[in-house]
Amino acid sequence: MMGCTLMGVTVVGMMASFPHVQERVKNWEDEVAHSQAVTDALLSIEGTKVLSDYPRRHSLTRVDTRGSFDTVAQEHKKRGYFLSSELKKRGITGIIPGSTRVWKYNTFGLTTKQIQHVGEAFVEVARENGLNII
């Protein structure tokens, strides 16, 4: 283990962090359910597709919104920045400004209340911009 300093330090670091990782994944089913809730809200917006496996088994999700938010961005005065701007007004940050085509989000560590807020915010933005909700 300590023959190569670079590899040894990496292994020791991983061993030291393992208890923290174990603690973080104790509620993995809840984390996946949270991801599924936001994914379902996004899928209720006509033209939105999930590019990750579905139903969700992970908290990181890749979505394609070229058929929904990107169509709004083409006509909107803020172009692709409208989505991040609208979400920021609602207290949601982290979406890369200008991203309305294909992007990722991660729901890990959010509370149920925060998950509901995020899902409702996406649907609200879609509704305000004339997108159909299925």
Predicted segments with their positions:
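Conserved C-terminal alpha-helix-loop-beta "cap" of PLP-dependent enzymes
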Residues: 40-133
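Active-site C-terminal subdomain of aminotransferase-like
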Residues: 1-67
